[in-house]
Amino acid sequence: MSEPRQILVTSALPYANGSIHLGHMLEYIQTDMWVRFQKLRGNQCIYVCADDAHGSAIMLRAEKEGITPEQLIANVQAEHSSDFADFLVDFDNFHSTHSEENRELSSLIYSRLREAGHIATRSVTQYFDPEKGMFLADRFIKGTCPKCAAEDQYGDNCEKCGATYAPTELKNPKSAISGATPVLRDSQHFFFKLPDFQAMLQQWTRSGTLQDAVANKLAEWLDSGLQEWDISRDAPYFGFEIPGEPGKYFYVWLDAPIGYMASFKNLCARRPELDFDAFWNEGSKAELYHFIGKDIVNFHALFWPAMLEGAGFRKPTAVNVHGYLTVNGAKMSKSRGTFIKARTYLDHLQPEYLRYYYAAKLGRGVDDLDLNLEDFVQKVNSDLVGKVVNIASRCAGFIHKGNEGVMVGGDAAPELTEAFLAAAPSIAEAYEARDFGRAMREIMALADRANAWIADKAPWSLAKQEGKQDEVQAICAQGINLFRQLVIFLKPVLPVLAADAEAFLNVAPLTWNDHLTRLENHTLNPFKALMSRIEPAKVEAMVAASKEDLLAAEAKAPAGNGELAKDPLSAEIEFDTFAAVDLRVALIVKAEAVAGADKLLQLTLDIGDERRNVFSGIKSAYPDPSKLEGRLTMMVANLKPRKMRFGVSEGMVMAAGPGGEEIYLLSPDSGAKPGQRIK
């Protein structure tokens, strides 16, 4: 017998900024099935994952909710962990990229790349939000498409005409965060010299590590010549600061795949039999597999292996890529109720229904998978309840009633037993190749043969005939043995059904090699229903609940075109949070334009016993700043001073409006005095 394989498996890291939906679950379910198959075969197979917990989106959402990014990612991780567990996804470790292990490994890999000459630095020009004091990623810039003039389009592509462009080509650009008009600024950035690994990647991507369709797509990138990859972002940013570079942070996609290593390292600290170096060092004999969606192939099949190569670590054995999920033949839709969250599904249906349906439709390619809800009901009810479970329910009663639950010995259908044994290698081969659909078809073909044989023997008719009891017991014992074989073959897909079947069969947890044996003169436990049919009404209720999720979200934003519709209310905060903000009346002593800044005014504010210097992006509404002098306004007086290019800003004045010329500086009623607290 060959030695057990050492295998490390990962799924792509879910982003810690939202809920898991059924599209996400396609990946985690297929990975889990493959891992369970390997463990069933006796291999050492470790499955790790983590939340992808860095980036501007997380920083900004936390700010909007009035919590820290650390609190946000902790809340999301708890939600994700619960959803995965209830879908029977059995990680050996589910960690976070915001961890000390990931910080250390990211710094190590960066340092090795830099020392080997694979890091370049140069100045880049980007849009900068003067109000938020941050550089803007493409998705945080909106404006008018330069091609078709559609408004409210993102900084890199138009959703209306499909055009792609540079953010600087966008007309009337606005910050999607503050509404301010962004300005162009230069910043020093760090780049990974991906072209250094062109030859290695051309060979590696054609070495059997990828499906042919994926390798062919990557060849387009490789043939056109690889470009250096920007791996840095400027503060403010939620992530890891680059060693020795204050105010510069690793781009989220730099440390995200390193999160695979970090999660495994975290697991190694709890399981001393695992050796991190044995899995990750160059020359490792362990196998490493990444399961990912086709939207992130470039990161995993170009950037990631190049980073590993340059830093002296091993590369993946294979990157297994899958397609997207559609529902009822179309993209998931919130309005149609087909954008279904994992928790919404679990509130209505059993997880194994979906696990089986995904398995039945998954091939080894990158084609999209369609969840047809009508077919879903029919297939699960027909295959699992009508075929597999039906065998046990047909036979168990006769054994308990006629022989006190004891299965007789002997083989009532040697040709059928041989057919089941002969099918095992092909089913195993399909599982290994991730061709789950083929495996399910072969298993259901066996179930059809078993049911046809039982129907032909008709033990229910024989039981009514004198002297036929031995034949009834032989038929039903054979039926239970065939059922047991099917359970073994389906165990990677249906772990709960398998556990319940093991309890009924009165056996220890089944392994793959148990299909080579039979139960004879063996006592069964009383049979209990192993799976119920899907009720179409429950599927309809799930879709309705998904629509309600959308309506609930819309209810928080008022209908119509009022100001709240344009700028919805932020999340509720506690009174203590509000009380921490010190609002004061301020007298504008001096107001003047700032040289070199299109939108800023420099205000000198009197707050009673002291004066403050404040920079404010209100110039577009107040082109003659001298008219503001002598006016009372309101300011946030305890805001931490912020160093800007033009000086230090010691607070923030309060204004309303969407921006541009529509900015309205707030003023207290007459009689208020500078320095008075606003309550």
Swiss-Prot record:
Short sequence motif 'KMSKS' region: positions: 331-335
Cofactor remark: Binds 1 zinc ion per subunit.
Predominant subcellular localization, coarse grouping: cytoplasm
EC number, as in UniProt: 6.1.1.10
Localization in the cell: Cytoplasm
Motif 'HIGH' region: positions: 14-24
Cofactor(s) essential for the protein: Zn(2+)
Domain annotation tRNA-binding: ranges: 577-679
Signal peptide (UniProt feature, chain positions): none
Record: residues binding ATP: K334
Positions bound to Zn(2+): C145, C148, C158, C161
Reaction equation(s) it catalyzes: tRNA(Met) + L-methionine + ATP = L-methionyl-tRNA(Met) + AMP + diphosphate
InterPro entries on file: aa-tRNA-synth_I_CS (IPR001412), Anticodon_Met (IPR041872), Met-tRNA-synth_bsu_C (IPR004495), Met-tRNA_ligase_1 (IPR023458), Met-tRNA_synth (IPR014758), Methionyl/Leucyl_tRNA_Synth (IPR015413), MetRS_core (IPR033911), MetRS_Zn (IPR029038)
UniProt entry keywords in alphabetical sequence: Aminoacyl-tRNA synthetase, ATP-binding, Cytoplasm, Ligase, Metal-binding, Nucleotide-binding, Protein biosynthesis, RNA-binding, tRNA-binding, Zinc
Any one biological process term the GO annotation gives: methionyl-tRNA aminoacylation
Disulfide bonds: none
GO MF terms held by the record: ATP binding; metal ion binding; methionine-tRNA ligase activity; tRNA binding
Gene Ontology cellular-component terms listed: cytosol
Gene3D superfamilies (UniProt xref): HUPs (3.40.50.620), Isoleucyl-tRNA Synthetase, Domain 1 (1.10.730.10), Methionyl-tRNA synthetase, Zn-domain (2.20.28.20), Nucleic acid-binding proteins (2.40.50.140)
Family in the record: Belongs to the class-I aminoacyl-tRNA synthetase family. MetG type 1 subfamily.
Function: Is required not only for elongation of protein synthesis but also for the initiation of all mRNA translation through initiator tRNA(fMet) aminoacylation.
Subunit structure: Homodimer.
Protein name: Methionine--tRNA ligase
Originating organism: Pseudomonas putida (strain ATCC 700007 / DSM 6899 / JCM 31910 / BCRC 17059 / LMG 24140 / F1)
Gene name as annotated: metG
